A protein has these predicted regions:
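Short, conserved phosphate/pyrophosphate- and ester-handling motifs at nucleotide-, phospho-/glycolipid
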Residues: 39, 187, 252
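Structural alpha-helical scaffold elements that stabilize or flank donor/cofactor-binding regions
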Residues: 115-116, 176-177, 210
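Conserved beta-alpha-beta core of the PfkB/ribokinase-like small-molecule kinase fold
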Residues: 128-207, 224-225
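Conserved phosphate-binding/catalytic region of the ribokinase-like
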Residues: 3, 144, 198-309
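Short, well-ordered alpha-helix to beta-strand connector turns
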Residues: 119-120, 181, 214
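Glycine-rich phosphate/adenosyl-contacting loop at the front of the ribokinase-like
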Residues: 1-68
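Short beta-strand scaffold segments in enzyme catalytic cores
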Residues: 37, 83-87, 225-229
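Conserved N-terminal subdomain of the carbohydrate kinase-like
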Residues: 45-127
Length: 309
């Protein structure tokens, strides 16, 4: 099973105006939430461990995961659902988040550990859940607990600079995790923000490789494709062509989910360190195709297994 932790929220997307008032559509979201949904649609076992609110937004979040074949392993709680105000220009989203006192932050280490059953092969974490507060510390501690039980760990920082009140502390946390995890994916924007002392992308990549111990390290570059690390070199893979771009919401999450699905289906999770370059390129092709199909639909709407055959 792929176990997923991290935020769930409602994306509030302005769809028009009425009587001088903005009209918004509420769409389920959150980077790890999107990843769980994307993986569940691709025919592997997925469990989502983050609490979900009992409010109407939470009902929609829960129903959306269940319809995508994701098991809800976290509790339903009375606190409200987190919100993200989304502005989309030329298909590219920007966000403002409201997460104080919300359901997805009410994690406890004891309840998380209860989900580390023999079914779990890999745990994925990332994005807002690691930004600040006691919940960020709990997630970091849970990574250690998972690794102690032989569970592989995957990280996608998916950095949101506007939400990070203490950048230095956040960078330290992410870099600590980078030294531990088995699978790491980050975007070129994540890379330059996290390694802000580097003068360019190449020096940032060198600094990254100097601290990671992951067997799978991927850098995504949007329409330029992606890079993967293999025996002391970076290798390029092109982006998969997008038929007609709707927007890029959830593209990175779909890509990361597809990486984990491919590794799971091809029984590579136990042999990450010896995967050959050709297989790694096949992995990137599969993930890029899934992300491309998501970009052809409005919002995060990842492809189903039959669409990727």
């Amino acid at each position: 099973m792929i176990l997923v932790g991290g935020e769930n929220l409602m994306d509030m997307i302005q769809v028009g105006n009425q009587n001088e008032n903005a009209l918004f559509e509420a769409v389920p979201g959150g980077s790890p939430y999107n990843l769980a949904m994307a993986a569940g649609r691709q025919g592997v076992q997925v469990g989502y461990v983050t609490p979900i609110s009992e409010d109407s937004n939470g009902d929609q979040l829960a129903a959306n995961l269940l319809s995508s074949n994701v098991r809800l392993l976290g509790p339903r709680v009375s606190a409200p659902t987190s919100l993200a105000m989304v502005n989309i220009e030329d298909g590219i989203p920007s966000y403002a988040f409201y997460r104080e006192g919300t359901a997805e932050r009410l994690v406890t280490l004891d309840k998380l550990i209860q989900n580390l059953t023999g079914e779990v092969a890999i745990f994925h974490i990332g994005s807002l859940a690691l930004t600040s507060g006691s919940d960020a510390s709990i997630w970091e501690e849970f990574v250690g607990e998972a690794m102690d039980k032989g569970v592989k760990v995957s990280l996608d920082p998916n950095v949101r600079p506007s939400l990070i009140a203490e950048p230095d502390l956040y960078r330290q946390r992410i870099k600590r995790l980078m030294t531990k995890v088995d699978i790491l994916k980050l975007s070129d924007e994540d890379l330059l923000w996290l390694f802000n002392d580097s003068v360019d992308e190449n020096s940032a990549l060198s600094e990254l490789i100097g601290i990671v111990n992951a067997d799978i390290v991927i850098l995504t570059q949007g329409s330029k494709g992606s890079l993967i690390w293999h025996y002391d070199n970076w290798y390029e893979a092109p982006a998969y062509p997008v038929g007609k771009l709707s927007d890029t919401v959830g593209a990175g999450d779909t890509f990361m989910a597809s990486v984990l699905v491919w590794l799971t289906k091809n029984e590579n999770l136990k042999r990450l360190s010896v995967i050959e370059l050709k297989a790694k390129k096949d992995l990137l092709y599969y993930a890029a195709k899934a992300a491309s199909l998501n970009c052809e639909k409005q919002g995060c709407n990842p492809p189903w297994e039959n669409e990727l055959l």
